């Protein structure tokens, strides 16, 4: 990516969970997770422990704790199943260059990281709703289960500049190495690093 796209802002919105910034053609780093990957009681405890910190420090520390917890692979970890991970990865790739530009992605056992730039006319909120709805139906079908698959919300962070973009790619692709699941980013099959290593 040689230059960041010209912003076309849709503004802030919230469904009552996390506030989101639909920034139009601004790259955004997204994390969404399985419904049982992180108990609400743990989040509540962390929020209480961090309540006296400044807001910026509190949010940064909470994000660090969440990421570390997710990397331990708690919960059902349905995405550890290759067929399930394939459904999610294929869904991400399907609308690349149609609804968004997909720069990096990673399907971990209980969560997914995506670095993407929504294309004009495709707000991030609608992209995420479509992606989670489709994959939930398909995964439930092959696992012969019903009910909730994903947490209803997602964490998003817009990319400020080229340096931040490069750091986000590295963070996403290095996640399975950091979690002790493989030795190199390109060893993890359900990732942009693996695809790039295959020349795809």
How should these model regions be labeled?
Residues 1-200:
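Short catalytic/metal-binding and nucleic-acid-binding patches
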């Amino acid at each position: 990516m040689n230059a960041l796209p010209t912003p076309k802002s849709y503004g802030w919105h919230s469904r009552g969970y996390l506030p989101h910034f639909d920034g139009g053609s601004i790259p955004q780093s997204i994390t969404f997770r399985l419904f049982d990957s992180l108990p609400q009681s743990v989040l509540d405890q962390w929020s209480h422990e961090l309540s006296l910190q400044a807001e910026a420090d509190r949010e940064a520390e909470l994000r660090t704790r969440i990421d570390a917890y997710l990397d331990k692979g708690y919960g059902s970890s349905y995405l550890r199943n290759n067929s399930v991970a394939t459904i999610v990865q294929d869904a991400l790739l399907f609308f690349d260059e149609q609804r968004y530009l997909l720069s990096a992605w990673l399907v971990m056992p209980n969560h997914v990281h995506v670095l993407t730039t929504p294309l004009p006319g495709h707000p991030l909120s609608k992209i995420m709703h479509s992606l989670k709805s489709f994959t939930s139906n398909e995964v439930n079908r092959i696992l012969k289960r019903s009910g909730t698959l994903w947490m209803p919300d997602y964490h998003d962070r817009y990319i400020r500049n080229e340096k931040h973009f490069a750091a986000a790619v590295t963070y996403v692709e290095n996640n399975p190495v950091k979690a002790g699941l493989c030795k190199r980013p390109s060893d993890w099959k359900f990732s942009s690093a693996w695809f790039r290593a295959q020349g795809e």
